[in-house]
């Protein structure tokens, strides 16, 4: 038999300029329908990737590992970033947007970016115009607290923006006293100041659970609950504790995670819900009235009624709920973890320092951005745990295998073990006996939602028994 050959397609007759023109029309149409139309109604959000520089040097941080890939130093020029941000603000108001602006960046609140960025936003939004965000969200490592001058400036900024109807909401990326070894070491005095500051402004915390620090997390969680109780900050006890979704998880570290979430689940059942099984079940199934002000909870069964309707998008900024824009070049990507040149969707153009239109560079990632669902991913679509899985990190998947849509095996092992463990634990506690009590029988969507939940739970339990 002769060698098999892959047919080579002759593209000599294709008008590439026409193809690019059509792709640009398509991309601009998609952006308008899937993002801009929502932004005008205050829905979804824009994620501003301002700077890729951070001095914290956290052991698990992707910016530490992949900074030059995701935000090359050569494109992060101060004057360019500031001019592009000014053009972005003009475009935001001219487009009649009112959605959340989310700053996802390195450590910038102690740099010269801070005053310039906030001054530009204040000048743009201080009028009574409706075209401004109600919330500006800033995840930050809160190291500015150690600098008295910077700390006072941030306090001033918060009050200044509150006076024009904008809540600057900060999320504290601080792991805690017993997990400081992989990050910046902080003093007890620092933590007291941090929590008083967060309490004053109703800020929450999003410490990370990594394969390296998970061994310390039971003691770390106790510390968080104790210090938040000491400061009488009950609202702050809803700490995020998101797992670092990378390939470093081993069988040993996964076992340590299971011990940790077992401890947290018991603690919440005993202390937060006073052993009320129905209320606890409503919380772990993310029933709206129980989780109104909560964030990701690593002891809940991550679930959304949207899954029943085929809207099972990955639960991070890679979903169609967020449009990321990098200020160094006004480009957009699927998310801040996938800003590799070959995956960058395209960039906004400027004429006379005004954003004019959008030019697509890679149309494929745009389709992934608006349409990729867990139920379509290889290795995920037939998984019985899919309805309870928060999903993997596309950026990490790409770095491991060059396949955006295939979860790295260690991450898959992590969530299979965790989800199976939680479902079995809650079943053994008798929580699922109360599912029917949560259902409003007159609400067709609720009936469908909880019926589907029961089916998924029973499938998982049957697989565990098998």
Task: Map each language-model feature to its residues.
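N-terminal [4Fe-4S]-dependent radical SAM core
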Residues: 1-48, 65, 94-95
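Radical SAM/AdoMet-radical enzyme domain recognition
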Residues: 82-104, 111-250
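Local cysteine-cluster metal-coordination motifs and their immediate loop/turn environment
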Residues: 53-65, 376-395, 414
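Canonical Radical SAM [4Fe-4S] cluster-binding loop centered on the CxxxCxxC motif
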Residues: 38-81
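Short, small/polar residue-rich loop motifs at catalytic or cofactor-binding pockets
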Residues: 315-321
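Hydrophobic "anchor" residues
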Residues: 329-333
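Short Fe-S-cluster ligation motifs
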Residues: 85-105, 407-456
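C-terminal accessory region of radical SAM enzymes
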Residues: 258-307, 337-390
């Amino acid at each position: 038999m002769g060698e098999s050959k892959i047919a080579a397609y002759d593209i000599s007759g294709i008008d590439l300029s026409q193809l690019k023109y059509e792709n640009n029309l398509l991309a601009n149409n998609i952006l308008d329908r899937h993002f801009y139309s929502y932004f005008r109604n205050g829905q979804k959000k824009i994620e501003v990737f301002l700077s890729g520089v951070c001095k914290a040097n956290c052991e698990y941080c992707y910016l530490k590992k992949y900074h030059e890939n995701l935000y090359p130093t050569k494109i992060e020029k101060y004057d360019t970033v500031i001019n592009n941000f000014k053009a972005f603000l003009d475009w935001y108001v001219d487009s009649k947007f009112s959605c959340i602006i989310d700053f996802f960046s390195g450590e910038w609140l102690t740099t010269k970016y801070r005053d310039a960025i906030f001054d530009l936003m204040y000048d743009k939004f201080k009028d009574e115009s409706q075209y401004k965000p109600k919330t500006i969200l800033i995840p930050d490592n809160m190291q500015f607290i150690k600098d008295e001058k910077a700390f006072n400036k941030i306090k001033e900024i918060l009050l200044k923006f509150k006076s024009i109807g904008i809540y600057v909401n900060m999320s504290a990326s601080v792991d805690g006293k017993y997990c400081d070894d992989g990050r910046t070491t902080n003093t007890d005095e620092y933590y007291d100041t941090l929590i008083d500051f967060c309490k004053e402004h109703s800020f929450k915390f999003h410490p990370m659970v990594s394969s390296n620090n998970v061994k310390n997390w039971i003691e770390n969680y106790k510390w968080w609950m104790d210090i938040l109780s000491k400061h009488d900050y009950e609202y702050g006890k809803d700490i995020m504790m998101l797992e670092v979704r990378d390939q470093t998880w081993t069988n040993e570290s996964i076992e340590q995670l299971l011990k940790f979430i077992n401890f947290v689940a018991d603690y919440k059942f005993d202390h937060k819900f006073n052993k009320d099984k129905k209320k606890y079940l409503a919380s772990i199934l993310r029933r709206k009235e129980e989780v109104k002000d909560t964030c990701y909870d690593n002891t809940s069964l991550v679930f959304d009624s949207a899954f029943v309707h085929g809207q099972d998008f990955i639960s991070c900024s890679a979903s169609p709920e967020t449009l990321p824009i990098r200020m160094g070049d006004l480009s957009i990507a699927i998310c801040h973890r996938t800003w590799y040149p070959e995956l960058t969707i395209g960039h906004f153009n400027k004429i006379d320092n005004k954003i004019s239109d959008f030019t697509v560079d890679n149309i494929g990632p745009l389709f992934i951005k608006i349409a990729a669902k867990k139920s379509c991913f290889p290795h995920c679509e037939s998984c019985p745990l899919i309805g309870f899985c928060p999903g993997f990190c596309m950026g990490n998947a790409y770095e491991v295998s060059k396949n955006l849509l295939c979860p790295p095996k260690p991450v898959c092992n992590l969530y299979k073990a965790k989800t199976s463990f939680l479902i079995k634990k809650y079943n053994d506690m008798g929580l699922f006996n109360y599912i029917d009590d949560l259902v409003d029988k007159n609400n067709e969507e609720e009936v469908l939602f909880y019926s589907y939940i029961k089916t998924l739970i029973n499938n998982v339990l049957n697989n565990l028994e098998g």
